[in-house]
Amino acid sequence: RETGLVASSVCNVHHWAKPLSHPDAAVRQEGIDAMIVAMEDEKAYGTDAVLLVPGIVNEEVSYDDCWNRSTECIKELIPTAEKLGVKICIENVWNNFLLSPVEACNYVDQFESPYVKFYFDCGNILVYGWPEQWIDILDNRIGRIHIKEFSRKEADSKGRGAGFGVSLTEGDVN
């Protein structure tokens, strides 16, 4: 606050190591606990949104298990979000989950809570679709937006991560 900079959101840094989709309930609880700390931190930083990667689909965690486990955990987090007046914003990343805007809408809508929103990342989504289409469909479910560039051409020729190595307006974000 002394610098005049305003934080838009806080990121729960433990969502990759302690995913809410993990097969072990103890690990999921650690993920819940980390989210509670992040929500308390965001309030202290003067923002009202925390970024959350809700889960990871892989060989050990099926899509439906990721959906069900992460849903259960987020339902446990909603009362804390309500109490603190902060939003849990689900981000689209390369976690093999919520691969279409319709799935993302259904996921957010199931909570029936104004404290669960979507953290839309224009660059991340270019692997799965077109940002403008997702934005139109997600509509008022979007709580925050990450704006960054991504080049499909660079990703195709040099590896997926290389897609981020371009300046704004030089990639495929419309």
Feature roles, as predicted:
Residues 1-72, 87, 124:
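Structural motif corresponding to the early beta-alpha repeats
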